[in-house]
Design a protein with these regions (language model features):
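N-terminal, positively charged/glycine-rich alpha-helical extensions of SAM-dependent methyltransferases
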Residues: 2-37
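Conserved Class I S-adenosyl-L-methionine
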Residues: 6-10, 193-279
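Conserved alpha-helix/loop element of class I SAM-dependent methyltransferases that forms part
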Residues: 44-62
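Class I SAM-dependent methyltransferase SAM/SAH-binding core
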Residues: 65, 71-114
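A short acidic, Gly/Pro-enriched loop at the edge of an enzyme's catalytic core
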Residues: 112-123
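A short beta-strand submotif of the Rossmann-like class I SAM-dependent methyltransferase core
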Residues: 126-127, 135
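A short, conserved alpha-helix within the catalytic core of class I
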Residues: 133-141
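Conserved catalytic/acceptor-binding region of the Class I
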Residues: 143, 147-213
Length: 279
């Protein structure tokens, strides 16, 4: 037996036991561990209607994979409509801040090498993270773990909307104050609908994330941005000082609760099986 044969047998045995060994991915770019606790505290969740819809288009409700789970918000919601959820993230600190749930199994693993058994997943969800991945490797991994006709769902959202005066200040902060500190991949969020997506896509309903925030919550959310943290690390000062006075004036009573909206972009594809060869 050759070395290659032994390697293949070990991999097959590991996979048959339900644990496909993931190799370390040294290329992971961790932009979130520094502010993991704030990320969990200030992020709004997706509406339940999103998860109900995704469950309705999956071939069954046995297993979902929340890929790049972050603080586990989506994983916990998926657990309301799936029997079991594997929630993975390449950041150990994000996983340490994730929300526990009896039907959610958290793992530290890169998106491109999940360690999930082949052909077992009904739904893969990637919430606000697809732009960070090595897409070719991730899509190969998605095809490996999905069941026939399993579903890949990727979502993204851009800047929040409150009201025009506040939106203008947030836009200025995003582009002018911390704009130079966004990782290059962030630009892909703004072109999310143009990202390669090599699965037959289906038309999806429109969804929005909605929150009710006071001014302190908005400032906390802006401070949790990776660009804000990178600015602070580079300049040893808080970039929010550049807009704080304008934001307070536009907001009014800082305790006033305002509706905050993010329109969601949702792309859903099916793991179509190849057609059998013609006889």
């Amino acid at each position: 037996m050759t070395t290659d044969d032994r390697t293949r047998r070990r991999a097959t045995a590991a996979e048959d036991s339900g644990h496909y060994k993931a190799e370390a991915d040294m290329s992971f770019k961790d932009h979130f561990s520094r502010q993991a606790a704030d990320y969990a505290k200030f992020r709004s969740g997706y509406p339940q209607e999103v998860f109900d819809y995704l469950a309705s288009v999956a071939p069954s409700r046995q297993l979902a994979w929340d890929c790049a789970t972050g603080n586990g918000q989506a994983a916990v919601e998926l657990a309301t409509v799936f029997d079991h959820v594997i929630a993975s993230d390449a950041s150990k600190k994000q996983i340490s801040n994730a929300q526990p749930h009896e039907r959610v199994e958290y793992r530290v693993a890169p998106a491109e090498n999940s360690g999930i058994k082949s052909g077992t997943v009904d739904l893969i969800m990637v919430a606000q993270a697809l732009h960070w991945f090595d897409l070719d490797r991730f899509y190969a991994e998605a095809r490996r773990v999905l069941k026939p006709h399993g579903t890949l769902a990727a979502s993204a959202y851009n800047l929040l909307r409150v009201e025009p005066a506040i939106d203008e200040i947030v836009n200025r902060y995003y582009h002018e104050v911390v704009g130079a500190f966004w990782p290059p991949e962030r630009a892909l969020v703004e072109k999310f609908e143009e990202l390669p997506f090599p699965f037959p896509e289906i038309q999806t309903p429109s969804f929005e994330m909605i929150g009710q925030w006071n001014l302190e919550h908005l400032l906390g959310y802006l401070r949790s941005w990776s660009a804000t943290q990178r600015f602070i690390a580079a300049n040893k000062r808080d970039p929010l000082e550049a807009i704080a006075d304008d934001l307070r004036a536009a907001w009014g009573d800082p305790g006033q609760m305002r509706k905050v909206v993010w329109p969601l972009i949702l792309r859903v594809g099916i793991n179509a099986m190849p057609k059998p060869p013609k006889e």
